[in-house]
Amino acid sequence: MRSVTTAFWGKARPSDGSPSATHPLPAHVLDVAAVAGLVPGHLPVEIDRRTLGFLVALHDIGKFSRPFQAKVPEAWPADALGPYPDLNRPPSGPAHDLVGLSLLGDTLAERLTPILPGGREGWLHLDRGHVWRALAGHHGRPPNPADDYQMSNKIVCNGCKGAAEKFVDDMIAVFQPPPWPKPAQGFDIVRFSWWLAGLTTLADWIGSRQEWFPYVSAETVADPAAYYHGHALPRAKKALAAAGMAKAVIAPFTGLRGLFPRIEAPTPIQRWAEAVSLPDGPSLTVIEDLTGSGKTEAALTLAHRLMDGKRANGVFLALPTMATANAMFGRLADSYRALFAPGSNPSLALAHGRAGLDKRFVAAIEGGAAREPRRGDPADEPAEAHCASWLAEDRRRALLAQVGVGTLDQALLAVLPVRHATLRLFGVTGKALIVDEVHAFDPYMRRELATLLGFHAALGGSAILLSATLPRKLRAELVNAFRAGLGVRKRTELMESSYPLATIAGVASVSETPCQPREGLPRRVTVTRLADQGAAVERIVDANRTGAAVVWVRNTVDDAITAVAALREHGMEPMLFHARFAMVDRLEIEREVLRCFGRDSAGEDRRRVLVATQVVEQSLDIDFDLMVTDLAPVDLLIQRAGRLWRHERGPRAVPGPELLVVSPEPVEAPAVGWIKAVLPGTASVYRDHALLWRSAREVFRRGEIATPEDMRPLIEVVFDRDAEGALPPALEASADDAYAKELTRIGIAAQNVLDLRKGYDVTAGAWDPDTYTPTRLEDRPHVTLRLALLVDGKIVPYADDPDTRRAWALSEVAVAQYRIASCPIPVGLERAAETAKADWGRWERESKFVLLALLVTDGDRYRLDARRENETPVIAWYDALTGLAWS
């Protein structure tokens, strides 16, 4: 006999060849519940999986409503609701997430109370609300009751109410959920709400894919229990495997060499990682050590131990830039499988998708670009559309893979009020989160990172932070943020000032362990001041004649391009590496940089000069004989110096490691324009000119950087703005302005990040869909240019790739919006432009920050006609060796 519930449709976008035009609502929710029950990973609270499955099955209960069912007139459930209303006046009302919230919280409360029992120590209405919002808000944001919530009881007609009641009874019969006693700690319900929202979103995404869950007839789900066990569960198992998310068995930890067999002699920090006693429960480890000490291998060793101890089921490595993520992906490609047992095929993903991804994981988004949904409330857009648009950008996949590598931004989006934040949060949950180059993040991102650590700890995750060195205050801030997520309210004071240093924090204690430096790393780098660019060119020309591998690190792209032009006037052909290249060219240059200056480089390949921006500061395993650098804050100078004489080699073309710093002399009483007179670009990048002055004063006074003994003292003295003589009067204004901006950034970050303790709720953050919440604060907003060419009347991507979407991604270059705000399409090519954009994702098509930039051949380079924000015409030039430049 046909049940009244099966008359209601849950999905109504049949693929070609589908045996049914609709997918019954009970079938869809059972598909999703089956996926949720099989998604691998730990549960953040004690809950029976039968109860969890039952709860997830309630996620779309709001579809028992006339307004939702009326969206597809031909699928109207006439058996339950009578004839379809007037076609000219279809039922209207709140989206189905709000209807669901009302049904769960009010209309069906009596039926659901036995599952979440009340009483003196039991569930309160407020407690249950956290669970209902997590289930109803599975379309990217928590439901916002406002006025519509008050209306939704009126919208649920008697026929819908009766069907919803029968549906709940059916689901209880299928899952037979035991009552879930209220957790002893109220905070457990709050943190569970974040996790449940992410799980439900992910399960709904997978459970909505027709290739994995084809539509069935109402008769097929007439017996819900038979459908669940005989249909939904087997398909869910196959779907998770096809998505690259099936459980991967962890390999037993056998020591560092089990992961890295080529390492003959572990470094001190690696030996520490092998043997240190890890605290019970989630832990935070902070490793501060020299460049080249093996921090990454030590972190992966700790991660493997956590995985083997069932405290993590994967790893996500977060880095500051795409270049560093690319380099880390390459380093992991040969070793990540050692984390898992033979026969496992774990997913490996690069956050911005510029390298080979696991084919099964890629399958999760293939075919997702089906028909575009009707525009309207996001809660009523089909889940397939969210899957396709949300996953179309490769960088978003990494958080769901067993092993992911990407920029920290991708993880930080998990704690910002952006769509699908909880899906990202769920992706991080349960993994060992490794964050590299922590010193490279500004105050805004550090506040975001602190929030992420709190969320991660609350959901049972462990984290490992890597840095050359951190100010003690910052290290304490991150440790306390993590422990706050564990419920520890008392702040911990960190006392140890040794270097290298390893810090481990758990719920019960914090330990600080001094470590020895790696043998061969302690050294002294001579520091020499150069008065200007001309002096730098002379030293580079001389060094190049001797066959030295030389790098000149400039603080702006424009200065880097100028430096290349100056060197070319001396008959040299330096390589240029910066962030203003199309991705396809940037990746090629990156490969060439690693070939010429990487660990395995030798001979004539190394007789080169590289001019680069800050992209060479972090995680690229490259090594130079001589370095010239523009003046920068001392921590960056130390980081850059780490690229000198990094690898063991034979005789070099210069007598010893030397850091040549282009800088004005740090006189006792500098003028207001002290830095701008010599390095105007640097003055605009590093706004605290007193910090630059203190950096110059200290390194030139010492005449060398001795590691490791100088690391901590240099950082502490330069960053102490309150010390006597730290603020020359003429530079005090710039220092105060920079400090005020730093406090402002921290304040903005505090406003932007989600509030863990409010649970998954609209009050936890500014969830307004029209509000843009960035992971990084930019002094100047940027736009993304998608470079294009006109070929045989068609506009095609600048990059050549058989995958059109990938080709467009490889054609991207970011530029400050004040320089290019728009790229007008030439008259007559408007239709060609629209055709080209049809291959873009919907977000890219609609974003005002993504521009189609048509290049025109002009001699041996390309010309781009664009406009500034005030509509003033501007001409830019592009070629694969220089990047984007202006006349």
Please identify what each model-predicted range represents.
Residues 332-402, 408-412:
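A substrate-engagement module of RecA-like helicase motors
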Residues 475, 534-601, 624, 628-887:
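C-terminal helicase lobe and adjacent C-terminal extensions/tails of nucleic-acid helicase motors
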Residues 252-288:
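Conserved pre-motif I regulatory segment
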Residues 486-560:
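Conserved interdomain linker/interface between the two RecA-like ATPase lobes of SF2 helicase motors
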Residues 314-336, 350-356, 470-474, 557:
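Conserved Walker A/P-loop ATP-binding site and its immediately adjacent core
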Residues 1-19, 24-251:
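Accessory nucleic-acid engagement/destabilization modules that flank
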Residues 426-432, 439-513:
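Post-DEXD/H (motif II) to motif III coupling segment of the RecA-like Helicase ATP-binding lobe
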Residues 281-303, 437, 441-442, 467:
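Walker A/P-loop
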